[in-house]
């Protein structure tokens, strides 16, 4: 099979107190089959002053680089003339919230495995998009919220009959983004 970019992730690097380059916030994330991502109105990703961008790219199916491969990211800067107000904007978090374990799983032929990951925030969160990603063996993924104040568990998104060529970042429409209250738990299954 011909090789293709499987992941192309970029993040900012900043200088620490000792003058060493260290990782900072993620800039973008790409997975095979993803069409791109859009930052919603009123949101931002901050580019630290004097930072640089580092790429982490790997290839599928054999891990070998693809000759003449090109990966790009576009950055738009906004300021007061654009009507952008940094104090009112909320900062997007592109962190990958993984399933527990994060290691190798032993799945027998024709077998199944179900894993879950949990994450809570100490502040309210608006979910702008959700991207299931399970490589070759995954068949379904769900994003739920458990609210300890109500004792209710709510399904936010689900992808069933999943395929590895379908790594789209599912964007919620304006006004329909799930709101997760402080202390609630996201459940990824």
Residue ranges: model-predicted function:
Residues 2-126, 131-189:
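Beta-strand-centric surfaces of beta-sandwich/beta-rich domains
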